[in-house]
Amino acid sequence: MKKKIIYISVIVIILIIIIFLMKFNYKKINFGNNESNKSANEVKEYILNINSYTAELEVTINSNKNTNKYILRQEYVSGDIEKQTVIKPENIEGIEMSYKDGNIEINNSKLNLSKIYNNYPYLSDNVIWLNSFIDNCKKNPENVNVYEENEYIVMELNLTSNKYLVNRKLYLEKGTGKPKKMIVQDDNKKDVIYILYKEIDLNKK
């Protein structure tokens, strides 16, 4: 009888340990160096409160004419810096675009803004900026949907003001809360812009 009680006690203790470990690891999100359990909505709030970031991104843009791919570096500090530099392709490498008060300044290039608009669609558009996505989410909270999809938490924004840029989805890594990719679709659900975040640092400044 005594052995039976000991056996049952051991099983109960093991079950308690297993349950504790399962709860501890359930939906663990790592923001910086602090690990804690975060729901999808908490991740959403984390993203909406980003005030600075630096990123290297691979951007694929599908226009009516062709498909263009770029490697870009972006630097953003709320109220101060909003700068984008082209790394690839080589023929426009080094072009730097600075944004301030709704105006765009082109540096290190013989191309003017009208040529960039015509030859490189969306390259100078704020739709490829993470902070633009965040601003639109804040202005249109009723059009934002947050859900889990495989290994991602997805923030989906639907706006009908531009038929070419109706649906935007930001895919966030569950383990870190970091943006991994963004997809922008038109009203026919065709991918217009695909952004892959190769590197990104959030709120470093």
Which residues does each predicted region cover?
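N-terminal leader/targeting segments and the immediate start of mature chains
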Residues: 2-81, 204
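Short, solvent-exposed coil/turn segments at beta-strand boundaries
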Residues: 49-54, 74-82, 98-103, 150, ...
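Short Pro/Gly-enriched beta-strand edge/turn motifs at strand-loop
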Residues: 55-56, 127-128, 153-154
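A generic structural motif
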Residues: 58-62, 85-89, 107, 158-160, ...
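Amphipathic hydrophobic-ligand
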Residues: 66-72, 93-99, 163-164, 190-194
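An acidic-aromatic
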Residues: 73-127
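A short, amphipathic edge element
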Residues: 133-145
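Gly/Pro-enriched, hydrophobic low-complexity segments
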Residues: 146-205
